[in-house]
Amino acid sequence: MVKVIFFDLDDTLVDTSKLAEIARKNAIENMIRHGLPVDFETAYSELIELIKEYGSNFPYHFDYLLRRLDLPYNPKWISAGVIAYHNTKFAYLREVPGARKVLIRLKELGYELGIITDGNPVKQWEKILRLELDDFFEHVIISDFEGVKKPHPKIFKKALKAFNVKPEEALMVGDRLYSDIYGAKRVGMKTVWFRYGKHSERELEYRKYADYEIDNLESLLEVLARESSSNKKVHPPRQQI
């Protein structure tokens, strides 16, 4: 019987794929507007390569961008990028469609809720607080505090311990097959793959670890209804909802 439901944050509860792309493009446009002597396509493609190399949480993307473009350090250009990025991020920050409605219903049904996410703790909490999602969750587990990222078992085991539940009493919902679904299944949790965002067609070799597949968060309620009505001792085969 499922007692606790864990959610990933990015592209599971918060629509970050579209947000990040818009923010990065606006940053480059604002840098050019303030004197960056490079065309948009060149600067943007270099920025994307930097993000691939250093990760999205690297704090010096725009500083390194100038180096890659063989340009001198210019705090005005860097500030223009930072300002446009953050202004866009705050303006476009949105929940995934249906997220709040589903969270409200899950609390009404008596489920305990948690978040298991990778990323910079300050940035992740900023998203949660700006969207006023914090009251839904008893615990928020962020990998940077643990020294490991999903799918490492440590972060999932810590989440289970926080709620004092067995793995079979927990269900993980996430958009990433490798980090969310494989990671949770490896410690014995039930899993729901949410096909959303830029990762919906990636890492398909890990699809077999999903007990259920959904295309919208409202379908999670149907998954839970099936789970609660099932008397089987084994997990049902993967089902598309």
Curated annotation (Swiss-Prot):
Keywords assigned: Hydrolase, Magnesium, Metal-binding
Keyword presence, rRNA processing: no
Example GO molecular function: metal ion binding
EC number: 3.1.3.-
Cofactors demanded by this protein: Mg(2+)
Classification via SUPFAM superfamilies: HAD-like (SSF56784)
KW Metal-binding (keyword) present: yes
GO biological process: small molecule biosynthetic process
Stated role: Catalyzes the dephosphorylation of D,L-glyceraldehyde 3-phosphate in vitro.
Family classification: Belongs to the HAD-like hydrolase superfamily.
PANTHER family the UniProt entry points to: GLYCERALDEHYDE 3-PHOSPHATE PHOSPHATASE, N-ACYLNEURAMINATE-9-PHOSPHATASE
Name of the protein: Glyceraldehyde 3-phosphate phosphatase
Source organism: Pyrococcus horikoshii (strain ATCC 700860 / DSM 12428 / JCM 9974 / NBRC 100139 / OT-3)
